[in-house]
């Protein structure tokens, strides 16, 4: 293998690595998530400024949707219980965004290069969706319960209360609200430390 091929493979590996990373080791604690993955904290702050959403709600939604797995997909469907026949839906990535709404996001924001497997893009998508939910259905951005119902059922589905016929969905939305509340409490206790920057935190730990 010549030097040009080696460089090419290294560049390709870097690009692939950048698209998605392993889930955080402590997904139950947002402070530990940010300490492990400082780039996720940077992305969360960008999303907060761009869309006016509280940091804890997009994270609570993504925890529920994918468990922070960049390659998460819906279960497969089977023909005659044996032959793989596509998937239950086109939802994919950290945010479990479906093809159609992801395309709407790209067109609306001009982010045509965005990928569902990239965390920065995924959290920006959730922030965009939450902002639209507030505009369309008047749901407060801190209201993780109703934000999640909109996220799951779509804006029209929420208005038509399609969630009422799904006995499992409202308890799931309550879990998202509870996780959002927990994340908010945790973040309040570590925000100052996180905002000090790497070297300030390093000397603080000594």
Put a short name on every predicted segment:
Residues 12-13, 24:
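Residue-level signal for mature regions of secreted extracellular proteins and peptides
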Residues 9-12, 90:
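A generic structural signal for short, non-catalytic loop/turn and secondary-structure boundary residues
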Residues 192-206:
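Low-complexity, Gly/Ser/Thr/Pro-rich intrinsically disordered linker/tail segments
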Residues 1-8:
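Bacterial N-terminal signal peptides that target proteins for export
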Residues 20-194:
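Catalytic glycan-binding domains that act on GlcNAc-containing polysaccharides
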Residues 15-18:
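C-terminal motif of bacterial Sec signal peptides marking the signal peptidase cleavage site
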